[in-house]
């Protein structure tokens, strides 16, 4: 009976939480109400640090007692590698090509599809009948890859016992967001999550920052692969090729692009009020010139990672960035910039605020933000300790924080499916709904 009450209370929390969140979102959370009961703490933990309880969680809680269940849950969630993955989840993930292909292979498939589509348009423009079957065959090498990325994320969120890892993967993926609808980013999203985000969500922020900076999904999305020193000229072989294909000249990088440098400081690290000026954006963009892709691997059917630093595209001059002179040093300039940004006090404050907003309240207590910022600085950006600080904070467990957050439609869907213990045969049907 207690199992049923726990699951029902979770379902009720989905609805009542919306009303409570609406009332509480207008004011900062301050721990003034009565302490949460142990059952409420358990429900709060699995809803805020996971995607909600499944019936099996209710059974375990009844068998162990809410207090012991909660203690074990919090301990295990901070060590996700110790939690065995269900066999059916492992089998589902093993069947997804997008998780097995390398970056060069993924980009190669995308380019093959683009080339086929371009050829079909050319034939149609000349009054010829395009080979629809051949075109569709090529496109079908790409379409499933985009859908499989979402399938992998949804399947893990529903079935993985490492719920904290899944929630943190969502948080940090959103923090380092890329848009799947831009060029080849869609086929690279799964690799981006798998290689640049997921391994670091309980690791070090600096490692995640570097992994995202060097990933082709980010380099394409924010155009850093197209950012080059002023006056850059392609190699002679490339110039001969372009002379034969003048329609491709528009794709040749022609100058500095500040998109990634701006997002890197404004969103990923310092924050909009992080104490930098437009000149700092420009100088950082100069430091990051040459950070791009070795697309030849995709053209010749190669394998492996695509990131490459091209010294010919790099601005080797000295820069003045955040009040300091940076001498020309090639790729090391960009790595130095990432070191500085990861360790900057404004980054600690920005991430602490965003973290507290995501897991406690839209207007979080300043005391909690300070605790998180102090933890980030003291540990050199250790995200496991950063998360542990959140879980250990009184503000997280306050009555005012309980059911004080809206669930996103994605989170609400996952919580509902988990409460009903449903695993869709094909998650793509849900994503398309």
For the regions a protein language model found, what residue spans apply to each?
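Positively charged n-region of N-terminal signal peptides that target proteins for export
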Residues: 1-4
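N-terminal export signals
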Residues: 6-24
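Non-catalytic regulatory/linker segments of enzymes
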Residues: 9-15, 34-39, 163
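His/Asp/Glu-rich metal/cofactor-coordinating catalytic motifs and the adjacent surface-exposed loops
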Residues: 28-133, 137, 191-194, 198-352, ...
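Structured, charged N-terminal subsegments at the starts of enzyme catalytic cores
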Residues: 137-141, 145-170, 174
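A short glycine/small-residue-enriched secondary-structure motif
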Residues: 145-146, 186-190
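Short, flexible active-site-proximal loops enriched in glycine and acidic residues
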Residues: 164, 168, 180-188, 221-223
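Basic/aromatic-enriched alpha-helical hairpins
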Residues: 173-177, 189
């Amino acid at each position: 009976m207690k199992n049923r009450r726990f699951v029902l209370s979770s379902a009720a929390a989905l609805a009542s939480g919306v009303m409570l969140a609406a009332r509480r979102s207008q004011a900062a959370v301050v721990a003034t109400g009565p302490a949460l009961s142990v059952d409420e703490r358990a429900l709060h933990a699995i809803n805020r640090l996971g995607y909600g309880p499944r019936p099996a969680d209710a059974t375990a809680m009844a068998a162990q007692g809410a207090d012991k269940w909660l203690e074990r849950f919090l301990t295990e969630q901070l060590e996700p590698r110790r939690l065995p993955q269900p066999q059916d989840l492992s089998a589902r993930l093993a069947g997804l090509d997008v998780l097995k292909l390398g970056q060069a292979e993924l980009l190669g498939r995308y380019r093959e599809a683009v080339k086929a589509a371009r050829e079909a348009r050319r034939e149609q423009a000349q009054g010829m009948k395009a080979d629809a079957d051949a075109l569709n065959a090529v496109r079908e090498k790409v379409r499933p890859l985009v859908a499989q990325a979402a399938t992998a994320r949804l399947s893990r969120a529903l079935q993985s016992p490492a719920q904290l890892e899944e929630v943190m993967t969502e948080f940090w993926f959103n923090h380092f967001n890329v848009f799947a609808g831009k060029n080849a980013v869609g086929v690279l999203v799964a690799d981006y999550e798998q290689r640049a985000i997921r391994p670091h969500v309980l690791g070090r922020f600096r490692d995640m920052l570097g992994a995202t900076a060097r990933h082709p999904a980010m380099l394409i999305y924010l155009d850093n692969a197209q950012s080059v020193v002023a006056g850059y000229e392609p190699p002679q072989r490339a110039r001969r090729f372009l002379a034969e294909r003048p329609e491709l000249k528009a794709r040749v990088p022609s100058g500095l692009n500040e998109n990634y440098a701006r997002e890197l400081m404004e969103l990923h690290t310092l924050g909009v009020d992080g104490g930098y000026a437009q000149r700092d954006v420009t100088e950082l963009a100069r430091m990051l010139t040459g950070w791009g892709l070795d697309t030849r691997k995709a053209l010749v059917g190669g394998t492996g990672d695509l990131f490459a630093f091209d010294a010919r595209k790099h601005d080797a001059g000295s820069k003045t960035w955040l009040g300091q002179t940076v001498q020309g040093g090639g790729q090391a300039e960009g790595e130095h910039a990432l070191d500085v940004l990861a360790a900057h006090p404004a980054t600690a404050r920005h991430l602490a605020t965003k973290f507290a907003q995501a897991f406690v309240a839209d207007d979080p207590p300043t005391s909690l933000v300070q605790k998180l910022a102090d933890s980030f600085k003291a540990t050199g950006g250790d995200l496991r300790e950063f998360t542990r600080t959140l879980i250990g904070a009184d503000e997280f467990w306050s009555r005012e924080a309980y059911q004080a957050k809206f669930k996103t439609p994605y989170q609400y869907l996952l919580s509902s499916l988990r409460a009903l213990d449903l695993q869709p045969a094909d998650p793509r049907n849900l994503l398309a709904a």
